[in-house]
């Protein structure tokens, strides 16, 4: 094992705290224009200045707990209809106008906005992509026969090359090619073909009670069993069994696919170099 690095913890304290008479449900930051987009549990979408908390704009939605996606001047949220998404476009700082609606024609399980494209997973095993500028469908992928059939989707993401799907169950992590619209790699394939490593955190001092985020240094140790072979439970530590993947995200700056489970984090390093060019062997790290 590599020796652990010298102990230190970076702490991020809130610069400001804003109180509201409504409970926030989903929050997205627009750092380039220094404001926050938020939905509330009561069904409101609003924007506010990040420094002063001044309310910039708001609109009421037809139902409680709306999910929100926001990126590059576009905003998408569910409007209460099981197969529809509302699309809004920013016309000036913090102010949006309705641009239309995406009507999938299938009950929506999850959706994710990246740039001007929204990815939708449906309860009847479809993965649909739309261009929010034209509201036109651009991709259709059938998830039947994969780990994600019967609506087994907990999170989705995408980039220029792939769609990423996470679900309940230890092997429910899938990479799908955007151009081919076919499965490019599954977690079962990764586990079967490549060695695994584990990460262990340093010990931390007792928290002081102030609200904060802590960025912890990690050091790698090799482990003979971190993710087990197919259809066996893999464990982070004795007695803790991984049950589902809660999120998946590609990090372009490091060519790493990051997946969050209910008991740990999985990194698949060099995954695009491997899938697109065959120029590197991927490394799996779980902690």
How should each PLM-predicted stretch be described?
Residues 1-57, 64, 83-95, 181-238, ...:
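Intrinsically disordered, low-complexity acidic/Ser/Thr/Pro-rich linker and tail segments
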Residues 47, 87-89, 129, 173-175, ...:
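Conserved blade-register residue in beta-propeller folds
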Residues 18-32, 58-73, 103-114, 143-161, ...:
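Repeated scaffold domains used in trafficking and secretory/extracellular systems
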Residues 104-205:
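Long, internal scaffold/assembly segments composed of regular secondary structure
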Residues 245-287:
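Loop/turn-rich, solvent-exposed surfaces of beta-rich toroidal or solenoidal domains
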Residues 28-39, 66-81, 86, 110-121, ...:
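Short beta-strand elements that form the blades of beta-propeller/WD-repeat-like
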Residues 94-103:
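Eukaryote-skewed repeat-based solenoidal scaffolds used as protein-protein interaction platforms
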Residues 50, 123, 132, 168, ...:
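Surface loops and adjacent helix of pleckstrin homology
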